[in-house]
């Protein structure tokens, strides 16, 4: 359980899961492709401040990671240690009864004793396997919250619930605004030839946000989860797997085209939605249909096992009655790779001339007057000197103040010195002489509790003070800000509509 080198028998959360996570982080620009947070990505006053916000975001995760580890460890101890056997049994019985009431009310017993609840669960398993799968998943996913509700005292439980409500509200409001903005800015406006007036744009933005809220409510009301929550995140996030190809290749490859971008988005979405449907309908619909045709089932079994064979045990596909042979992370990876392939192939087929990247990114002759001039990073890297090369690799430029540089170097030292350094040391050490189990216990206690608590305490005080200061500054700037009506998100002739006067000025001076 604790030794990460002993994961060959794991089907879902193995080394391939980690590999896909690393690949997705690079491919997606460390979260830039997750459109649920695009409001944060686009809210900075300029590109430099956006870069600094991402640097600060690395320190923000210390306390969160520690809380996840602590609550999980507490729940595991409570449900497995002999000293809490009676209390844990009562918690499990109550949880199963609540899950039955949620998934299959007809099977929920009137008497919530252990024997009655267990018997009802067994009847559900025998009579409705598909619904039992949802029941079993919810029971597993709700174990930690159920344990916390039983062991926390009244006041502390109330504070914890209040914190969860605050987090849910901030997340849902951000997501509704982000997805509503995407519907208006990236779908409605490009298809509409006549631009919106500011009043129309705000009206339709509010309508879109309302539609997103209604959809989220209906989806949550009718959807039954059948897989781990992290796998659910992976497969639903894969709906926008094509966004990585659009952003990364669109910014760094001048032959990318709009047709290639649409194909990448459509291919990624189709694979994700198709995989999501297969995962949820496999037990109740898909597999029974396959079982009715033994020849088709045999062919699918042979084909699937032949494809995954070279990659076993990290990718292990087996056609079984209980679940779809691909998990959410594998579907996510397939969607990303397919989106990249679709973008490249279609762009090469439809590209007539290279796109002017300098014009779009304000480089060279297209640099704006309010932007600091600095040689590109690859030009800086050609200069001699270790510090110059390191500066180019880290992305530190003339926009960085002394405080910004201190923050950036602190993240570099933390990520490469502590994070990558300890990782590499532990890997080499264990390849030569594997650690005993107790050493892993000590290591995770130091890294996940001690170090994380220090980072969490420092960052909490730091962000509370700095966040309050920046919030007041933002309100002051908003009071003085005068909106540019042309800067409404439209793209004309390959650039933002707000940049057209600047381009016209350059053309007149040429």
Q: What does each model-found stretch correspond to?
A:
Residues 480-504:
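Solvent-exposed, non-transmembrane helices and loops of integral membrane proteins
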